[in-house]
Amino acid sequence: MSKLMKGRKIRLAKACEQNRRVPAWVMIKTNRAVASHPKRRNWRRSSLKV
């Protein structure tokens, strides 16, 4: 794997990790004040600048 591809793979993995829902315990702790997060990304609707 080249250096360029490795960097891209790491950035894609980071984007994949960030694209998760808010944990259930956070919703319970905040009485559903925090129910969703605005940086949620759909793979079809928006493109990544990786």
Swiss-Prot record:
Annotated SUPFAM superfamilies: Ribosomal protein L39e
Source species, domain of life: Archaea
Matching InterPro entries: Ribosomal_eL39 (IPR000077), Ribosomal_eL39_CS (IPR020083), Ribosomal_eL39_dom_sf (IPR023626)
A Gene Ontology term for the protein's cellular component: ribosome
Keyword annotations from UniProtKB, A to Z: Ribonucleoprotein, Ribosomal protein
Biological process, per Gene Ontology: translation
Disulfide bonds: none
HAMAP family hit by this protein: Ribosomal_eL39
Protein name: Large ribosomal subunit protein eL39
Organism listed in the record: Methanoculleus marisnigri (strain ATCC 35101 / DSM 1498 / JR1)
Upper classification of the organism: Archaea, Methanobacteriati, Methanobacteriota, Stenosarchaea group, Methanomicrobia
